[in-house]
Amino acid sequence: MTALLDATDAQMATLADLVDALQVAEATLSSMSAARDGLLAIAGRLAIDLAKQGNHPDRGDHSLRTVAAEIGAVQRVSDRTIERRMAAAELLVDQFPAVWAAQGAGRISPAHSRVIVDAGSGIESPSD
């Protein structure tokens, strides 16, 4: 990069520190996103457990929407948005645990996880 040819040693050191700090910040954000996905997956399982406890004529849809509405209220998003997030989180956590773990460790971003899940969702297991 020719733009850095005129940079002083102090400026280069500052840039290196900024890059390192941003890398740590990104890894932390990825880790926190994985933690949120884990919590959303648990919330989805809770909704299913609640639905199974009774003989619901809506087959548990009300339980799912109620759990999603509770979460959505504090996150300031709709229950449908939370339902989608819970479904995506359950898929990531249950079907792609190594990807979820890599994201949790900050080795990959949530965007990387989505691409892997999207690409891998259509692949059938050899045992199927």
Protein language model features and the residues they cover:
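Peripheral, non-cofactor segments flanking catalytic/redox cores
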Residues: 1-128
